[in-house]
């Protein structure tokens, strides 16, 4: 007999949503241990990955332009000319530091408690237009592309890491894949909710 899943609750209860995703993807404590193992040996990898993905974002004007916007959390000197924007620009260095913190957090987290689920949910929400003054408002296509690229870069780093044995590499790669599908879902959840809200607002007029 099929297990019942409450569709409406998936949209309102983060724990319930995560539990469903975890069961579907078979994301277990073993995967969390594999991610924690990567975190213990991957500080240089995380540092380089952060720079690599921002270099990728600066390769296209459509993604580069997002970093020319003023955001609530950046207090440094803004480079406002896209032609002058580089990895050494203050707003990019700030973002590189932020994503390093994010990667360290999601890889080191040993217990996926409600506070952590709120964290990865909020990371998604601020990229939409639903977080008020905290919103970055990035089109989802760029978020999705970045997750794909980020996962690829991390997996490539794991494959070529000399301090990780082959068995553990396989476990880490599988765990990373599950991790980013879950995180991507926690992003798309907010984008879909925003789309539903917009459609409901139109119907109400």
What are these regions (language model features)?
Residues 4, 18-23, 43-157:
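Heme-based O2/NO sensor domains and their adjacent alpha-helical segments
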Residues 36-41:
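Short, motif-level signal for alpha-helix interfacial/capping segments enriched in acidic residues
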Residues 1-32:
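Charged, compositionally biased N-terminal leader segments and the immediate start
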Residues 2-3, 9, 16, 160-205:
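Short terminal or interdomain "cap/linker" segment that borders an active site or interface and mediates
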């Amino acid at each position: 007999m099929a297990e019942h899943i409450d569709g409406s609750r998936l949209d309102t209860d983060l724990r319930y949503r995560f539990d469903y995703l975890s069961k579907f993807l078979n994301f277990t404590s073993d995967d969390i241990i594999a991610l924690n193992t990567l975190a213990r040996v991957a500080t240089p990898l995380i540092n380089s990955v952060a720079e690599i993905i921002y270099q990728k974002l600066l390769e296209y004007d459509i993604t580069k332009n997002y970093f020319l916007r003023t955001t609530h959390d950046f207090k440094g000197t803004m480079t406002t000319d896209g032609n002058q924007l580089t990895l050494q620009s203050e707003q990019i260095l700030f973002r590189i530091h932020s994503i390093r913190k994010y990667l360290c957090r999601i890889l080191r987290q040993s217990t996926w408690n409600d506070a952590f689920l709120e964290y990865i949910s909020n990371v998604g929400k601020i990229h939409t237009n639903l977080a008020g003054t905290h919103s970055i408002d990035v089109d989802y296509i760029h978020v999705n592309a970045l997750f794909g690229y980020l996962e690829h870069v991390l997996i490539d780093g794991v494959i070529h890491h000399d301090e990780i044995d082959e068995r553990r590499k396989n476990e880490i790669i599988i765990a990373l894949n599950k991790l980013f599908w879950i995180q991507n879902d926690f992003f798309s959840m907010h984008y879909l909710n925003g789309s539903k809200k917009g459609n409901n607002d139109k119907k109400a007029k």
